[in-house]
Amino acid sequence: GVTLRTVSIAAAVRQHFQDIGHDEKVTDVTYENAQARERTQVLMDIANQQNGIVVGTGDLSELALGWATYNGDHMSMYGVNGSIPKTLVRYLVRHAADTCGDEALAAVLYDILDTPVSPELLPAEEDGTIAQKTEDLVGPYELHDFFLYHFIRYGCPPRKILHLAELAFAGRYDRAAILKWLRTFFRRFFQQQFKRSCLPDGPKVGSVTL
C-alpha cells in the first residue's frame, strides 16, 4: 500500500523568497520554480530518512518539451515514466478505471482524467479552478506526441510531419494550429536539450525514447 503524508512547503518557500529578496506577489518563473525545487528537496530528504529512493513521475512528453523545472521535478533517483508519452498515460489510467472493479477507485481515476494537466505552481482562480493549464501554454499533448513519434521513430522532417498531422487530425485541428504547435515542439525540443543531458535512469518501454 501507500502511506499518504502531507508536508507543507509554504513556510520554507516564503523563507527562501525572503532570503533571495523575491516578492512572493510576483508570480513569475522564480515563484514557480522555487516551489518545484522545494518539493524535490523534501522528497529527496525523506528518501534519505527512509533509506529509499525518489521515483520520478515525469513522462516522455514532458521530457521532449522540457516541461519540467531543472533540478526540481526534472530530478529523481529513477524515472519510471521516462519513455511513456502522456497520451499513453491517459489510456493506461482510463483502462485501469474501466477494469479495476472498484467504484471508488474508478471515480478517482476518472476525476484525474477530467482534471487539466498542470504543475499547479500558480495560485488558483477565484472560483478555485486551476489557473495554470499546461496544454494552454505548450499545446495539446496528442499533437506533440504525434510529432515526437514521427520525428524520433522515423526521422521525418518538419514538412512531412505537418502533412501527416493534417491528415491524422483533419476536422480537429486546422493547418494554422498544427503549424503553431509544431514550431513550439521543435523550438522547445532543441532548446531544452540541456535538461535531458542529465536525466536519471529509467526503463525503455516502447520504440521511442529520449
Task: Annotate each PLM feature.
Residues 1-210:
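ATP/NTP-dependent adenylation/nucleotidyl-transfer catalytic domains that generate, transfer
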